[in-house]
Amino acid sequence: MKEGGAPIAPGAPIARRMRGAVLGRRAAWWEAPGRGGAPLVLLHGSGTDAAMLAWGEAVPALAGPRAVLAPELPGYGGTATLRRPYSVPRLGAWAAAFIRERCGGPVDLGGSSMGGAAALWVALEHPHLVRRLILVSTYGLGGAARRPRLAYAASRLPISLPVMGALAASERLTRRVLSEVYADPARISADVVARSRRAALTQARTGAFRAFVRAETGREHFRTDLSGRLRELAMPVLLVHGLRDRVIPASAARRAAEAAPRARLVLLDTGHLPAREDPAGFNAALAGFLDG
């Protein structure tokens, strides 16, 4: 049993850490085997996130009928960072290269927050690579996210790397930051705090999160807004969002579900991280979409 209390079925496929190259540079990812069919690729979010911190419950639960791959995105978990700017198009191009080089063909593609924006970009720019699309608490759907001016200012001051170092050093501060993205702070386990602190230490070294915020924030708004292109999506789309998301409001997902021609919307009683806060509900939603 892992974070959130969702049991992992006996005999569930074990995810193994893999290393290789994407676009000729160092890459790491987690992979659980499957019996065939299109693999599922899951892209994690930003900040103190990482592949198996985001998807640790989902990977073994969804693998078996299909292989599941969860890459460490550039600047996270041992993958070389992107050359600047660290923008959604640059991140999406990396994800498309991962699919081509490591999967060899079309996949079911999902992403959370920053990773959701990258997944959406891939689906729009390289639709031949995406059979089905899963958008979880996704950035880039339009509408107001919180505090663009604050993010803009912070990304341009030399403080974000020391802040990440402070998170890595302080259990109390890390728990306080996580309480902003969890609807129920009681769901923040000691293991999650410890792993988030390790992820913060990585960001203190690589600066990928700061680079992403710097690339994506203007003085008055966030730069990526793909909501006007949602009608271009020909593939089935699943949107999963937390009703109590204080980072990206659920209204953004509702509007996106109305705009995408073949969209399905699942709202869970969580904050910004439904895969962590309600793994049973989240995995059931994805399994129904993928196997239905």
Q: Where are these predicted regions, by residue range?
A:
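Alpha/beta-hydrolase fold catalytic core
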Residues: 1-42, 63-66, 103-105, 287, ...
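Conserved HGGG/HGGXW glycine-rich cap/lid loop of the alpha/beta-hydrolase fold
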Residues: 31-78
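Active-site loop/oxyanion-hole signature of alpha/beta-hydrolase fold enzymes
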Residues: 69-110, 284
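Flexible "cap/lid" loop of the alpha/beta hydrolase fold
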Residues: 124, 132-163
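Conserved alpha/beta-hydrolase catalytic His-Asp/Glu region
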Residues: 167-229
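Short beta-strand/loop motif that positions the catalytic acidic residue
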Residues: 233, 239-241
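Acidic catalytic loop of the alpha/beta-hydrolase fold
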Residues: 244-248
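Catalytic active-site module of serine/aspartate enzymes centered on a nucleophile-bearing elbow/loop
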Residues: 262-292
